[in-house]
């Protein structure tokens, strides 16, 4: 089957990853020891996308299912908490790869010094996992861009895997620094250096933002003091939604490559804004029967987006929607068309039919139907602009730079990363303003393109 190898790097990546495996295991009826306890053949039909079946424990019980997951960090702390967590016994012990020194929120340590020493060990495990696959579809990495390990070592790993498996899809779930909530002073540096790598080396990057997740918890879910567990739960719902079609039968299937082909009009513009519906508070779920129109409306709502950008400030280049549950295909098609017609000014006119829909028959646990939203919108430039402004403010004064140059980095790298990110913003802006009649000349200097959001 089309397998996906999951990598989780750093503290944030491992915490999101751990939650993701909880949700996926529940959907496939696999308990915390990797034993199948489900009640439907559909759960096992394509379980091999994310799980490797180890040898049978006893004749009657069948095998143990082991996640195709590689957990890495530069300090042992998070690994220990994953290992002692509810699903800690699920993972293959050899797939925990960690150092002792930590990256200290320093991208250079993760990318050039500490991380570079550990990366070969990780690649050995990656090769071993890939050899266990019949037909590897690609990789997914969960990490944050603000710290040291997830950002520095995560991007190093991406470029190494890209060299070795150039024709496989590389998918990342990247937690970007929030506008108001900041964990680390040097977040803008780490994020800019990471985005510089992601632009070149990934096929699809889902931008997730803690602040947007907090807002969803406060406003929509009515959770008064959300924990990281609540936030990670939201992220893992999206992750599970994106790969549903690979794991369960459906009427209209999508896989990572189909998504990439439909979602990425230009190779550099592969940063997506994810969303999920229905977001109802935990207690009230079972009291509401959702309809397809409600799902669609909620899914396109700015309040449901998991990145702190307002899609109304830009235009959608492309959109993908993955619906789950028993529903009428006709109704889904009509609703998606209605959204496009009603809000046509928010979709670029030069990509007709720019909404891709997939429908899978099996709903997530506890819901009758749900939908996952993936939008490639020019409004994502707000996110890059924000990081760029914070980066420039510090870099102008060369604040904190000695931590990076001390690990062997050069100032030139910072300048390059900054201009690459500014180019990205200009490209988004350029396509936001383009109309179907424009003669597109790629030679036009992108710096000249300016203008206000619609």
Curated annotation (Swiss-Prot):
Residues annotated for GTP binding in this entry: 11, 75, 144, 148-150, 210, 232
Cellular localization per UniProt: Cytoplasm, Cytoskeleton
Family annotation (InterPro entries): Beta-tubulin_BS, Beta_tubulin, Tub_FtsZ_C, Tubulin, Tubulin/FtsZ-like_C, Tubulin/FtsZ_2-layer-sand-dom, Tubulin/FtsZ_GTPase_sf, Tubulin_C
KW Ribosomal protein (keyword) present: no
Protein keywords: Cytoplasm, Cytoskeleton, GTP-binding, Magnesium, Metal-binding, Microtubule, Nucleotide-binding
Residues that, per the record, bind Mg(2+): 75
GO biological process terms, semicolon-separated: axon guidance; axonogenesis; larval behavior; microtubule-based process; response to light stimulus
A matching Pfam family: Tubulin
General function of this protein: Tubulin is the major constituent of microtubules, a cylinder consisting of laterally associated linear protofilaments composed of alpha- and beta-tubulin heterodimers. Microtubules grow by the addition of GTP-tubulin dimers to the microtubule end, where a stabilizing cap forms. Below the cap, tubulin dimers are in GDP-bound state, owing to GTPase activity of alpha-tubulin.
Family to which this protein belongs: Belongs to the tubulin family.
Other facts noted in the record for this chain: Beta-3 is a developmentally regulated isoform.
Designated name of the protein: Tubulin beta-3 chain
Species this chain originates from: Drosophila melanogaster
């Amino acid at each position: 089957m089309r397998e996906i190898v999951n990598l989780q790097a750093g503290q944030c990546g491992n915490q999101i990853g751990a939650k993701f495996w909880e949700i996926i295991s529940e959907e496939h009826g696999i308990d915390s020891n990797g034993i199948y306890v489900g009640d439907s053949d559909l759960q096992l039909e394509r379980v091999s996308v994310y799980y490797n079946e180890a040898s049978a424990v006893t004749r009657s019980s069948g095998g143990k299912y082991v996640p195709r997951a590689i957990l890495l960090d530069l300090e042992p702390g998070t690994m220990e908490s994953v290992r002692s967590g509810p699903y800690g016994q699920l993972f293959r012990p050899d797939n925990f790869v960690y150092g002792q020194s930590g990256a200290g929120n320093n991208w250079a340590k993760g990318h050039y010094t500490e991380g570079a020493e550990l990366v070969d060990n990780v690649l050995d495990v990656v090769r071993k996992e890939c050899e266990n696959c019949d037909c590897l579809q690609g990789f997914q990495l969960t990490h944050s861009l603000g710290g040291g390990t997830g950002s520095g070592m995560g991007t190093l790993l991406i470029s190494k895997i890209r060299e070795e498996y150039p024709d496989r899809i590389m998918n990342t779930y990247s937690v970007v620094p929030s506008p108001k909530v900041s964990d680390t002073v040097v977040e803008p540096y780490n994020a800019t250096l990471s985005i510089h790598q992601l632009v070149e080396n990934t096929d699809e990057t889902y931008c997730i933002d803690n602040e947007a997740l907090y807002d969803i918890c406060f406003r929509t879910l009515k959770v008064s003091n959300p924990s990281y567990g609540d936030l990670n739960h939201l992220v893992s719902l999206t992750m599970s939604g994106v790969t549903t079609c690979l794991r369960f039968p459906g009427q209209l299937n999508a896989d990572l490559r189909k998504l990439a082909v439909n979602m990425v009009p230009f190779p550099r513009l592969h940063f997506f804004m994810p969303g999920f519906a229905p977001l109802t508070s935990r207690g009230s779920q079972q009291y509401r029967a959702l309809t397809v129109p409600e799902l669609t409306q909620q899914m396109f709502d700015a309040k449901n987006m998991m990145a702190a950008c307002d899609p109304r400030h830009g235009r959608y280049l492309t959109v993908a929607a993955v619906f789950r549950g028993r529903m009428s295909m006709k109704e889904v098609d009509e609703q998606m068309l209605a959204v496009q017609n009603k809000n046509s000014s928010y979709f670029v006119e030069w990509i007709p039919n720019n909404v891709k829909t997939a429908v899978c028959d099996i709903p997530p646990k506890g819901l009758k139907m749900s939908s996952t939203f993936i939008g490639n919108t020019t409004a994502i430039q707000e996110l890059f602009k924000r990081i760029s402004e914070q980066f420039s403010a510090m870099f102008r004064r060369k604040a904190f730079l000695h931590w990076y140059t001390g690990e062997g980095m050069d100032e030139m790298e910072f300048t390059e990363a900054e201009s690459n990110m500014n180019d990205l913003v200009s490209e988004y802006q350029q396509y936001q303003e383009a109309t179907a009649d424009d003669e597109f000349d790629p030679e036009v200097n992108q710096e000249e393109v300016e203008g206000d959001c619609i």
